[in-house]
């Protein structure tokens, strides 16, 4: 893998300056680069870009400057594959540890470049009661998901990433954002003034881990291949609904793999302490990536 070139270092430096507050940084690993999706300010969020994020335990909310936290693999292990990780949290907060940073580190250890997305929240728990939420899923969370895919592709050469193997992985509400980004696969604009807007926003694959709103996941022919996982004990729209999602992908002729774990419920994420079969879903995901040729066989 090539090291970061001066242009990339400059880009990162600008992004660091523009990320809102030291308090917000406290929740993120201190040794990881953090990149603002829009270094000059997020469209529609300009007036609130300097507000600090709200951090309660491992949950983050009050996000007005969407970012990617970067986990690059060791050069000797790099596969060229990249995954944007989208934590869940009911669109009110992001469960940034067990559905974000721990996943990013695991993927990097497997040779996969990972980027943990903090996106704008449609039901942000930092918004005062009785106040209209400033963001929506289909406008702002989607825009952040699309921008994240484009940003990673735009810097693929700098990070030795194959721009044809850039996927997304989402948990719960984050799975909704991933599925929506895949369904609203926006092409790039080769004439755009902003070079980040030139690549396609279509993820090459998607992994949906106990995603919500399963009834709204309607793939079309040519949709990105999908890896699905959930717990038998999850709520019905997920534990049963994900089986129907799998069938929709199959009927559309889109490669799909489904895992339902008998002993699991909702929100198992990635925890080192989870030694159950559900705790091994990341290994199953990596096997699927190899099988689909997004990750080379070692």
Task: State the predicted function of each range.
Residues 1-11:
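Bacterial N-terminal signal peptides that target proteins for export
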Residues 235-241:
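Conserved alpha/beta-hydrolase "acid-adjacent" motif
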Residues 250-298:
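C-terminal catalytic histidine-bearing segment of alpha/beta-hydrolase fold enzymes
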Residues 228-230:
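Short beta-strand/loop motif that positions the catalytic acidic residue
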Residues 140-223:
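Primarily recognizes the serine-hydrolase "nucleophile elbow" in alpha/beta-hydrolase
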Residues 232-235, 263-265:
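Acidic beta-to-alpha connecting loop that harbors the catalytic carboxylate
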Residues 10-19:
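Bacterial N-terminal signal peptides
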Residues 34-35, 41-60, 64-67, 74-83, ...:
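Serine-hydrolase catalytic machinery in alpha/beta-hydrolase-like enzymes
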